[in-house]
């Protein structure tokens, strides 16, 4: 065998340039970059060194042979020609990985079988002994890549992927692979910062991958020093003495590195369930003396190194997966930006994000950006110098002013910490930092919100209302409905039509979400966002979240429970406020029937108004339980019936009479507990006829729905005394949207 070998090193997409620099520094020659890989030439010592020291590679492949290939037979004979007895015992184990397609092979499993067959046939002994397949821990892992008619046959020297360092046995929901984390640290300048004695802090550390990789770099620990089994361990070409020499050198370097004064490396994680797994990972890496992890929110993040040294803040914020995550992610980035500006002045920061647009919401400019891939997700690494000239705040500076600031950076005096009488540091007064500046669109949106607040202010105060709609798609480009619930904000985003560029729609949403807390003077953690779109099947009733957090609100002398997070609607239709108040005024001494009752808020008002009895019918057990809580909250119980059932079937079976009936049906509904599908336009006549049959003489039926295209059937107007009262049932906060609902008063003709 030759003294030099062709090597292929694979890596995550986007790391090729960094890996080429690292591999060249470790001795690889004639280095060339490919997609998700590099190649070069090296002797065996360099090949071993790459396995041991590469922080960025996935695998180190030693090329055995290249050969042209036209079909499966060429593949078989090309592999068969290799002197496999120089590489593997006849009773050894193999695993074959095949990549690429063409030359008559479009199935990688078939290609791998042909490679395996050739190796087995070559090594089969006269007495029938032959290699067997072990896909988990083989003696030899063989890789064949088919590239434009050429087969490249290699041995995998690494065995399992090199990103598996052995310390991370516990991980969070969205982990970074260790070699990607190392690449981000290298791009962020951590090797330089660590060599200068700088600190590192991760405000969203998860299970500590950034922390451990940073500690290994700072302590000069080979990333794979603890690996016991390699792809070359049972390879007949392995040179154990050479490997032991390199491994002993790495052990000596690690011992010397750990003997140094430890770098100040700290992680903070809001989820208490991840704290112990993170500490366990750190302990397995042997870095417990270097790295500490604490529970803490981003909003209170403040790194306090022992020697007041500056350093690097690095983090990988979570990716939004659930409906409504946009708001929480936006405010997370805003909080991060605020903490950087307030607590990390003159530090460097590196934010690895799958949502680069959110990175613009931190209120700090990035001076460099790098593209990476986290699996199949394109990501950006934003590098930031946390200095005042990079802050994006309310004050707009000219390019000339920014140039002056760059040429004359602000000097920040480092003040020695004062201690209290117990010898503990006295926490300094927080630095006052301006809020991040809203975009032009965001400021325009904020102005509209404040204008609406001012216009409704007198009415709100006069009526004693603190739950009302402050914005309802007033500006077409900001298609939101925004409701105030005292000191909470409930935001519903109307799904953008397909003709709207998704990136523009997302940017406008972020502009609006950034503006809402400032314009309404509301804590950003009390903003809840949902997306409202056409629902199908039972989705209109499905749970969106599972927080189970109910708020108590008051209206017209009654108390009601709302839930802003768990369902698409909150349990209280604000637009029906006037209708509920009308029912309360008219209910005294009457038998009240509430059909499609939802959470029975109208029944609570009827009971408050002195109704002789209330009966509420709904198909959902969840909403009826909610209704029971609403009634109990107000001390109403015995005379108020709650029945689960299909309204149409219930009306057909019921023979009781009612003096006051309220019907507010959905546009459509289907369920396993009902026959067929209810459609309000189609079924209105049958529904109202059935309800009118239950109306006592002199009684009143109120019918309402929010189907914008609804047309009341003319037969109903001929049969009953029908009055359109829509205008009387819409308050000032919904006056901008006259089609929010339609309402009619229906009575028997005299």
Curated annotation (Swiss-Prot):
One of its GO terms (cellular component) is cytoplasm. GO terms for molecular function: 23S rRNA (guanine(2445)-N(2))-methyltransferase activity; RNA binding; rRNA (guanine-N7-)-methyltransferase activity. Keywords: Cytoplasm, Methyltransferase, RNA-binding, rRNA processing, S-adenosyl-L-methionine, Transferase. It is found in: Cytoplasm. InterPro entries: 23SrRNA_methyltr_KL, DNA_methylase_N6_adenine_CS, RlmKL-like_Mtase, RlmL_1st, SAM-dep_methyl-trfase, SAM-dependent_MTases_sf, THUMP_dom. The keyword S-adenosyl-L-methionine applies. It comes from the Bacteria. It catalyses: guanosine(2445) in 23S rRNA + S-adenosyl-L-methionine = N(2)-methylguanosine(2445) in 23S rRNA + S-adenosyl-L-homocysteine + H(+); guanosine(2069) in 23S rRNA + S-adenosyl-L-methionine = N(2)-methylguanosine(2069) in 23S rRNA + S-adenosyl-L-homocysteine + H(+). Specifically methylates the guanine in position 2445 (m2G2445) and the guanine in position 2069 (m7G2069) of 23S rRNA. Belongs to the methyltransferase superfamily. RlmKL family. This is Ribosomal RNA large subunit methyltransferase K/L. It comes from Pseudomonas savastanoi pv. phaseolicola (strain 1448A / Race 6). The lineage of its organism: Bacteria, Pseudomonadati, Pseudomonadota, Gammaproteobacteria, Pseudomonadales. The gene is rlmL.
